[in-house]
Structure formats: structure tokens, C-alpha cells
Amino acid sequence: MGWAVPESVFIDYEIIQSAPKIFNYSGIGDVLCFFTGVLDWQYADKRNKCESKWKYDPKLASESLKYVDELVANIENIKNMNEKGIQSIIKAHQWGGNSFFSSGWNPRHIEGIEHFFFYNLEFLTNKKFIHGQPVCLGFILGCLMHNKLEERFIEFFKNLDFNFSPEAMNLNWDDVTNTLKTLRSYIQKNNLWYGIGSDFEYSSEILIQLKDIIDKLKKI
């Protein structure tokens, strides 16, 4: 088909609203990941391990976090999947893509440990997923690893009927355990950018914490 640059993108809200909510809710994963991406970037910066081409940029990081704030603030609109809720997700995706290439193909402010977890999970299980489910599970994991699981995120998930437990993805906790045990080596073997996962050493404590949070969200 060759190379083409779209001149415009049209959004049909009615078509989006008619889709199963699990697909639309899935879009939150690729906004929440801005938060854990920035945490990983800050983690690398504090240890002088940022790539020379992707040095920590506080202005870019701050701008990225604003989209997370806006997403969380629009929980009711997202829950109802009205136009304002859809826009809060689309705006973040649009900015994320644009800022990726405009900052020198820098993924630091939009992706980190949450996606690395997902990539390894997909690699080990050889399964395909609704993207937002494993990413949101990885987001909770990343927040726990950074000790930054804020209450606003728990409340956000409580208000959405979006199940991203292993069972909802036809997995079990053994799959998650295996993913965690091999996470560090996966990151290193695939030359993924340095973050908290690069230093991660598996312990049952992190699994217990993750399972506890997911079990609580399932019971809401």
C-alpha cells in the first residue's frame, strides 16, 4: 500500500459508544501508563542511567502526568462513555503519539514497567489479549513497585466495571508469578530502557500485594 500520511481523522461517537465497554475501557491503560512511565524515567534519572538521547525532561514528564490527572478526573464521563469521557481518552492517546515522535521517538514519558510486564506475559503465555487488561494489571504492579499506588487510582478502578484480573484474561496467578520471576531477565535480554524492572528481584511479597489489590477490586 505504500506510505501515506492521513490528512484528517474522523471520530464517530455513536460507533464508539455502541462497542462493548470492555474495548473502550481498555483505552485507559494506554493513558495510565504515562504515570508509571514517568516514574521509571525518574527512577533512571536518579541513578544516572537515562539514555543520552532521552535525558529526563521535567517539562515533558509534567505534561504527560496532566493527561493522567484529566483521565482520573473524568471517571464518571468515562464510566458512562459519553462524548466528554471518550474525548479524555482520545486526547491523551493523540498527545502520546504526537509527543513520542516529536521528542525524538522518546517513549520514556508514556511507557514503562507496565508494558514490559505485558510484553513478558504475552511472550510466556503465547496468548493475545485485550490490550488494556494486562496493561492495567501491569500498571497496578508498577505503582506497587514504585510504592506509588495512590488512592485515587484505586477509586478510579472501583468505579469502572473493568475486570483485568488474571481470570478475566483466561490466565491464573501462576502465569503472573512466572512473568514476575522472569521480568528482569526479559527486560535485559530485549534491551528495554532502564527502569525499576531492570533491578527487580522477585519475592512473594509483591505478588501477595498485587493479588490483594486485584481481589479487592473484583469484589466491588
Residue ranges of predicted features:
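Phosphate-rich cofactor/ligand-interacting catalytic cores and adjacent structured alpha/beta frameworks
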Residues: F34-D45, S52-N80, I208-I220
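Generic structural hydrophobic/aromatic packing signal, biased to beta-strands
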Residues: V9-I11, L32, L71, I89, ...
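C-terminal charged capping/lid subdomain of soluble metabolic enzymes
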Residues: C33, A44, N147-I220
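A glycine/threonine-rich phosphate-anchoring loop and its flanking beta-alpha core
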Residues: M1-E63
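Active-site segments that bind and position negatively charged phosphate/pyrophosphate groups
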Residues: W54-D161
